[in-house]
Amino acid sequence: LFPISEFLKHITWDSLQDVDAHRQIIYDAIVSYRRMKNQGVVAVFHRDRFDRFSNFARIGEGSLGGKGRGLAFLDHIIKQHPELNAFDNADVMIPKTVVLCTDIFDEFMDTNELYQIALSDIPDEEILRAFLQARLPERLIGDLEAYLDVVRQPIAIRSSSLLEDAHYQPFAGIYSTYMIPYVESRDVRLKMLRDAIK
């Protein structure tokens, strides 16, 4: 909190007559500090502490995957180079990100015995049906609910392939991006989010 107090000590409070203006200055200082502290950090997702100031969080203990690592790297670079944001109306930032690590994927595939189906020659529609009928790891559901309690805007769900990370092989972008619109019902959004993840 010392950076906040350092910022606030330069403000002449006697020139402000409005108590709401005082509150707004303090609030804005705290928000700026929280954003600055969260930038460039890959935080472990904790459902009881996740809030709108969280910038990049991971669920699980496995690898972040290629897209996750790339976004984390860019976020770190942006934090190291504040001059990137020296222009009015041109903020350089990554999208707020939550990554499901590879151990979540492995648990999903193993628990639902999906590897045999995924690697078979059956039609894609049948593979998709099997994935949509499968259950996500139970430990993930509470985290997704906590995430949806905070995020009140459309959500993009991206997937990675191990081959996307391979050198000299242009294999990126073979998986679709799924967009979930914001709707008031958390249950509806949770169903859409679960299906998109699968």
Give, region by region, the residue ranges found by the protein language model.
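Nucleotide/phosphate-binding sheet-loop regions of phosphoryl- and nucleotidyl-transfer enzymes
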Residues: 1-198
